[in-house]
């Protein structure tokens, strides 16, 4: 009973974390729910960019790829190699779409914060920023990773998947349970903190010094944004691979 109460407390903490606010927000009332409108707007923008690039890439496929198709195939190979390395040769192929979607969404979201002049768009309330600049987005991505983790383990092993919680000794049961719920929490905090800090540093420098001075910081932000997307996707794949591996 104590373990169940701890688990419920952790889930409630996720809900509390999603209420953390940085800056001003535009709220939409949907039924009995209040949602962050600017997060949905920027997320839809990112999805539109990804869908647009996908359509441009596949509309005229060639036997010998060139240009956009060549880049898309290289990107696919990169994601497949990442999934193969972290998940394993036998299981990785079915998880390539999930890992690829995570990586591309986070990557484009992060870059949109540095490349898209969100401040030009004026809202009645709040301000636009990268989707990953809002902890609601990062917590949602982390929870998706957690759901994928349990789905992968249960789909392969059934209820025997839960046997790993009493290995190597039943005494570690509470710690093993907490570990699985704190993994996505660390993922969301890492991504949210890095993207928010990067945008705040650039905003402060732009307000204090001429535009040319913050450019090196912006370039560094683009690099670290890509690294953060890679780290998130790699750790998500590693967690899924961990749930699929055999425990003896």
Swiss-Prot record:
It is a multi-pass membrane protein. One of its GO terms (molecular function) is proton-transporting ATP synthase activity, rotational mechanism. Pfam families: ATP-synt_A. This is ATP synthase subunit a, chloroplastic. The chain crosses the membrane at residues 38-58, 96-116, 135-155, 200-220, 221-241. Its main location: plastid. It is found in: Plastid, Chloroplast thylakoid membrane. PANTHER family: ATP SYNTHASE SUBUNIT A, CHLOROPLASTIC. GO terms for cellular component: chloroplast thylakoid membrane; plasma membrane; proton-transporting ATP synthase complex. The keyword Transport applies. Keywords: ATP synthesis, CF(0), Chloroplast, Hydrogen ion transport, Ion transport, Membrane, Plastid, Thylakoid, Transmembrane, Transmembrane helix, Transport. InterPro entries: ATP_syn_F0_a_bact/chloroplast, ATP_synth_F0_asu, ATP_synth_F0_asu_AS, F0_ATP_A_sf. F-type ATPases have 2 components, CF(1) - the catalytic core - and CF(0) - the membrane proton channel. CF(1) has five subunits: alpha(3), beta(3), gamma(1), delta(1), epsilon(1). CF(0) has four main subunits: a, b, b' and c. Key component of the proton channel; it plays a direct role in the translocation of protons across the membrane.
């Amino acid at each position: 009973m104590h373990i169940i109460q701890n688990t419920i407390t952790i889930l409630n903490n996720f809900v509390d974390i999603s209420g953390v606010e940085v800056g001003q927000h535009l709220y939409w009332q949907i039924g009995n729910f209040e949602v962050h409108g600017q997060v949905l707007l920027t997320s839809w923008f990112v999805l539109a960019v990804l869908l647009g690039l996908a359509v441009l890439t596949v509309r005229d496929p060639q036997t010998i790829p060139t240009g956009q198709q060549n880049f898309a195939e290289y990107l696919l190979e990169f994601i497949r190699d990442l999934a193969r390395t972290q998940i394993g040769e036998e299981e990785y192929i079915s998880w390539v779409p999930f890992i690829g979607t995570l990586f591309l969404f986070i990557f484009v979201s992060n870059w949109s914060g540095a490349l898209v002049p969100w401040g030009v768009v004026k809202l009645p309330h709040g301000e636009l920023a990268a989707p990953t600049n809002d902890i609601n987005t990062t917590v949602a991505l982390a929870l998706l990773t957690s759901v994928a983790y349990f789905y992968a383990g249960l789909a392969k092993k059934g209820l025997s998947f839960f046997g790993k919680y009493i290995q190597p000794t039943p005494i570690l049961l509470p710690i093993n349970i907490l570990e699985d719920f704190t993994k996505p929490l660390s993922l969301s905090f890492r991504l949210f903190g890095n993207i928010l800090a990067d945008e705040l540093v650039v905003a402060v420098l732009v307000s204090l010094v001429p535009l040319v001075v913050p450019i090196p910081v912006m370039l560094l932000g683009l690099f670290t944004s890509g690294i953060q997307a890679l780290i998130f996707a790699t750790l998500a794949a590693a967690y899924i691979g961990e749930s699929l591996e055999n425990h003896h």
